[in-house]
Amino acid sequence: MAKKVCTDEEFITIWREHQSPDKVGKAIGLSTRNTLKRRRTIEDTHGIVLDALKPNGMPKIYIPDEQMQANITIDNGTILVGSDCHYNPEYVTTAHRGFVEFVKYLKPKIVILNGDIADFASISKHHRIGWQKRPTVKEELDEIQERLGDIEKVRPAGCKLMITIGNHDLRYSGLLSNLTPQYEGIKGFDIADHTPHWKWYWSIMVNQTCMIKHRWHNGIHAVYNNTIKSGTSFVTGHLHSLKITPWTDYTGTRYGVDTGTMACIKDSQFSYTENNPVNWRAGWAILTFINGKLMPPELAEVVNEDEGLIYFRGQLLKV
C-alpha cells in the first residue's frame, strides 16, 4: 500500500484525534514504527508534546498551551503563596484564616494558591476507608467558592489571583472527560469554571528567576533537588513540608521552597496516614521582590491549630 502524504499540521490534527500510533499509522498509511519516528520529529520541530493514550485507555494530562506557563514581571512587591488547601466543608482552618489576614496586612501584588485547593476524595481512584464520611463534589465546590471568596473580598486593588493545577484538582475534569467526553467545552465541566476570578496555570515563572508550580521532585530532599536541577528558585507544594532550602553557587543564591499545607494536618481527609507521624506543617510562603530580585523567602507557620496561633517574624499571631 502506498504511503499517504500529510503535512505536519495534518499529522498533529490526526494524532490529537486518535492519540494512538497504531490508529494514526492506519489513517496516514505508515507503520507504527515510522509513525512514532514522525511524531518525534514533529515534536522536536514544533516544540510540542503529542501525548498518547495510556495502555488502560486513560489519556495523559493535557493542558492547553495558553495555560502551560504564566510569565510574570514584578519589580517591587510581595507574592503570597499558599498551597494544598484541601478545603474541607466541615472546618475553616487556622492557616486559611491567617492567610486571609495576611492578604489584608501585606497587600500583595499577587496571590497564588499552589495546587490542590480541592481534595475530591469521593472521586479518587483510592478506595474509601471503612465507612469514612467524605464530602460530595458539590459540597467541596461550594466550600472552595466560599473560601476563595474570603480572599477575593480583602485583596488590594490590582492584586492578581492565580492557581497552579494540582493533582487533586485534576480529579474533577479528569473523571468527567473520561466518562462523558461528549460534554467537552460545556461550562461547568472544568474546575476553573467554578472559580471565575482566578486564573489557572500549570506553572508560573516570575522574572525568569523563580518558578512556582505544584510539584516536581519528591522525598526529603525535594526542594533541594528542585532548585539545584532547575537552576532557578523553585516554589512547590504537594509535600506539605513548609521549608526553605537555599543554594549558592557562582551564579548567586537561589531558593527551594515548600509551601506546606493550608489544611489542618489532623483533618479527616488525611486519615489514610493511619495516625502515623508525618513531616507536615501548616502555613504558607511570602516572596518579596526588590528591584526585581527575590529576597530570602519567609514562612508563616501554624504552631497551634486549636488556639489559632501563627508564628511570623518573631511574633505569635492569633487568628
Please state what every model-predicted region is.
Residues 73, 81, 105, 299-316:
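Polar, enzyme-active/binding microenvironments
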Residues 44-66:
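Short Lys/Arg-enriched helix C-cap and helix-to-coil transition segments
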Residues 191-206:
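Short acidic low-complexity segments
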Residues 22-41:
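Short, basic interhelical loop/turn and adjoining N-cap
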Residues 55, 82, 87-193:
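Core catalytic region of metal-dependent phosphoesterases/phosphodiesterases
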Residues 209-302, 307-308:
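Conserved beta-sheet core of the metallophosphoesterase superfamily
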Residues 2-20:
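Short, amphipathic alpha-helical "recognition" segments used to contact nucleic acids or chromatin
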Residues 60-93:
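Mobile, glycine- and charge-enriched loop segments
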